[in-house]
Regions:
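Conserved glycine-rich cofactor-binding loop
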Residues: 12-14
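Conserved glycine-rich Rossmann-like NAD(P)H-binding loop of the short-chain dehydrogenase/reductase
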Residues: 26-42
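The beta1-alpha1 cofactor-binding region of Rossmann-like NAD(H)/NADP(H)-dependent oxidoreductases
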Residues: 58-69, 102
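Substrate-binding pocket helix/loop in short-chain dehydrogenase/reductase
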Residues: 95-97, 104-106
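Active-site helix of classical SDR
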Residues: 120, 155
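Residue(s) in the substrate-gating loop at a strand-loop-helix junction
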Residues: 139
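C-terminal beta-strand-loop-alpha-helix "lid" module of Rossmann-like NAD(P)-dependent dehydrogenases
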Residues: 173-220
Length: 284
């Protein structure tokens, strides 16, 4: 039997890199995409060292025609596309809505929301054909806002809303969907230098606000730190293997505790999913 073809976005670092390598080791044919050519070369070396094969391809998810072209090419070359992990989108602009420029908001939304949406739209015809799996990584901040994460939370809320609305519809055509909601994960995006590049701020005269990175680093330190990125790959593989995966999945107890007050008794999204299915059923 031919191996299942899995497309993973954002594989040049962090969770995407771990997911791609772990999936290849588990027997998937993995198409690993990213937009940093130097790091893609490093990923190829790491795959070779681990004795796994990756089909590594350049992809800038904000280039929507390129997204459609690449996903179409993947389906043609491999003959099918069985699963997509759309997880590129760790773009931050720390600060309040007052501080972050309008261009800063657009910059964050363009990658975190519109880029992932382009991947989903391009992949769905192929996933319907294979009755495949769609996993979309958002964040615990896609359900619960957090101070100084205004733009990031907005982008993740938007993605959560789109995928939550989509999931019960595409399920009727054989596509099973899961929204993955990590808390802080030990990736490069959590490094201070990464944030400093993305502090797209308007000047606030006599600003009462603390320095955003200092605030965030203290919060992370007081909540038990970050999740090891190596924990995420096996969790994604488990979700891909489930016959009836949940609509929602939090990768760590911290994330579950963080979103629980808002989700109450529906942590895995089953109740909202069933309500949506009933709503669809009203149309006959």
């Amino acid at each position: 039997m031919a191996s299942k073809v899995l497309l993973v976005t954002g594989t040049t670092s962090g969770m995407g890199r771990t997911i791609a390598l772990d999936a290849a080791a588990a027997g998937y044919t993995v198409v690993a995409t990213g937009r940093d050519e130097q790091r893609m070369a490093e990923l190829a070396k790491e795959a070779k060292a681990r004795q796994v094969e990756l089909d590594i391809r350049f992809l800038e998810i904000t280039d929507h025609p390129a997204v459609y072209a690449l996903i179409g090419a993947v389906a043609r070359i491999h003959g099918h596309l069985d699963a997509v992990v759309s997880q590129a989108g760790g773009i931050f602009a720390l600060g309040t809505a007052e501080q972050i420029t309008m261009d800063g908001f657009r910059f964050v939304l363009e990658t975190n929301f519109f880029g992932n949406l382009a991947v989903i739209k391009a992949a769905l015809p192929h996933l319907r054909a294979s009755k495949g799996r769609l996993i979309v990584t958002t964040s615990a901040n896609g359900l619960v806002g957090a101070p100084y994460n205004d733009a990031y939370a907005a982008s993740k809320f938007a993605l959560e809303g789109a995928v939550e609305s989509l999931a019960p519809v595409v399920a009727r055509y054989g596509v099973r969907t899961t929204i993955v909601e990590p808390g802080p994960v030990a990736t490069e995006v959590m490094a201070p230098r990464r944030f400093e590049k993305l502090l797209l701020h308007d000047a606030v005269e006599n600003s009462p606000y603390p320095e955003p990175w200092d605030f965030l680093s203290r919060v992370i330190g007081n909540t038990g730190g970050v999740q090891a990125v190596e924990e995420v790959g096996p969790q994604i593989l488990d979700l891909l293997a489930r016959d009836n995966p949940p609509l929602r999945f939090q990768t760590a107890q911290w994330a579950r505790d963080f979103v629980a007050p808002k989700l109450s008794a529906d942590l895995d999204g089953k109740k909202v999913y069933e309500a949506s299915e009933a709503y669809i059923g009203l149309a006959g």
